[in-house]
Structure formats: structure tokens, C-alpha cells
């Protein structure tokens, strides 16, 4: 019964130590969950034999992968963190939420790779269930806002595999209660780029993290790696909008000079269900252009470039 899916996650007190997430307190509401229960590197034994046939192999460096999405909304109370921020983003190089009249989710910029998660999941029910458990999970996250849809976050994580999947059922979960997500539209969403209210089609923000399995004798860990010489975190994304008349707003000077500009996105109007993100460090890349319903559209990539630790993005719920 593939329609039965249970997902639990909990922040670990120390890396790789099983936090034992419980169905009563640590369940998540997710969609499009696509686990890879086991992943390995494969080493072939290069032995000579007196007959033809496949060489024996050894599966090494065991890990587990989880891809899933969550709806992007508040917790229902302005001063209460949303679980996607207090739990899931902790595995994405974020610190613990700062709680005041609203909640701020700060970027972590220390010398290590930040907090980690114990992640449990169950696919199927009685007779065909599979329980998966990973420790030390870290992950990337991509925020998606598209006009006419609800906003959501896509997570892609890797955890250390200490025990293989089994047929032990997870208890019936107590799911968190939070407001329904609201449509991205003119009534619920405001977006400005360099203080100008663009006619926005979509906005994505990718944390640019690359979770990677690292294995040595006496040490296994999921780290944030990079294969292009950049930092562990490289926040980037895409803005798709109607190109404004250049007399009203001309972005080409900022693009030409790689000049940082400000961005603000506020989604939601009801207290407890407002999500906002802002940056003064947004650098636009080279745009591409298309037409939509006889209107000129611009798709422009961007990068958030900090000039101090963790100051490239402010993420809040209120």
C-alpha cells in the first residue's frame, strides 16, 4: 500500500547519535517523498579464476537518501516556529530559531556543517511495510513560489545508514496542526526587487548545499561539499517576471555592474501564517527573454553574496 507514508524527523543532540524521533511528537506532513532505502559504492574483487563469469562485489559506504517536499506556511501562531524551520532547516546549515514577536530562522556560518537529523520513514502498511532509519542526515532545500500555486520547499537529504530497512511498523503518528497554505497571488503576496514591485510569475531560492557522504576509518559523516571551488552554501535562484518598461525600472545597470540590490518577499496576510524572506545582497545574472500572452517576460538568475557571516538572507514567520 504505497499510499501509506509516515515520516518522522528530530534534531540530534550530537552528530550521528540517534535522536529516536517519536510518532507522537516528531511526525511531519510531507508530499512527494521518494526515499532511496539503501545506497552504496560498489567494489569489485579483481580475482583471477579458471572459468568465465561475473566477479564478486562488495557494497561499501552505506547511506540512505530522502527527497520530499513540504508546504510552506506558518505554524498558526506568530511566535511559534514552523516545523520546517525548527527541524528540517536545522539540517540545512541553519541555526536554532530566534523567537520574539515573530520567528527568525538564522543562517549558520560556523566552521562545521551545523546540526543534523535523525530521519525515520515508513512505506506501506500491514503485510508490505518497510521502515527506514537514517542518522546524521543533512540536506539541501529549495523554496518555490509560483503564481497560482501554494508555496513549498523541496528537500534532498542524505543520512548515514546504520541499520538496514526492516518490517517494524511505526506507531500511528500525531500529525502537526498548522494553517492551510495560501495561493501565491496579488492578494496574498508582495514582492519587490530593488524597491520596485515586479509583476512576478515565479521565484525560487536554492540554498545551494551539496550534502555528501564522507567516510574514513573511525569516522562517517554527511558533510556539505563543493565541486566548483565555492563555499558550502551558495544561495541562488531564479526570478521569472514581466519585463518592466525601462522608463519605470531599468535593471540592466545592476546586471552590467554585478551590483547588489535588495529583494523582499512577503507571503500571507493572517498572523501565524506569514512567511517572509529578504536580502540586500542579491546579485543578478544574465537574463533570458520570452513572450507570454503577448507580453515580454524576463527570466533572470541571481546569487545572494554575503559580506559578513550569514547576512545574505533573512527568513521569518509571523
Predicted regions and their residues:
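Signature of extracytoplasmic/envelope-associated structural regions
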Residues: 1-318
